[in-house]
Amino acid sequence: MSHVDVTVDEATINAIRQRMLETGDWERIQKLLRAHLEESGWVDDLKDLAKEKARAQDVPNLENLVKQISESAAGMVSDNVKRDVMLEIESVLDREVDQA
């Protein structure tokens, strides 16, 4: 997997997203991500963290809870999950570039 820093304009990103929606790749990758997050225990870990943070609040505040959880959520995703999903995205992009 090669990582190249490339600045991509918003129009290009929107065009890629639209193409992925049209081909069904967007939904397929979302399902893959959800499955990996479930299998890795991330979903349960996130629920546990949310319960812990909610119990620690003096005054229940959903907005603050969501902010706290959101700050931790991405960092809790395993490297294997990130790698697998990135490989799939790269595969889709490579295929689309080859077809263009």
Curated annotation (Swiss-Prot):
GO terms for cellular component: DUBm complex; nuclear pore; nucleoplasm; P-body; SAGA complex; transcription export complex 2. Keywords: Activator, Chromatin regulator, Cytoplasm, mRNA transport, Nucleus, Protein transport, Transcription, Transcription regulation, Translocation, Transport. One of its GO terms (molecular function) is transcription coactivator activity. Its main location: nucleus. The keyword Disulfide bond does not apply. Involved in mRNA export coupled transcription activation by association with both the TREX-2 and the SAGA complexes. At the promoters, SAGA is required for recruitment of the basal transcription machinery. It influences RNA polymerase II transcriptional activity through different activities such as TBP interaction and promoter selectivity, interaction with transcription activators, and chromatin modification through histone acetylation and deubiquitination. Component of the nuclear pore complex (NPC)-associated TREX-2 complex (transcription and export complex 2), composed of at least SUS1, SAC3, THP1, SEM1, and CDC31. TREX-2 contains 2 SUS1 chains. The TREX-2 complex interacts with the nucleoporin NUP1. Component of the 1.8 MDa SAGA transcription coactivator-HAT complex. SAGA is built of 5 distinct domains with specialized functions. Within the SAGA complex, SUS1, SGF11, SGF73 and UBP8 form an additional subcomplex of SAGA called the DUB module (deubiquitination module). Interacts directly with THP1, SAC3, SGF11, and with the RNA polymerase II. Belongs to the ENY2 family. This is Transcription and mRNA export factor SUS1. The gene is SUS1.
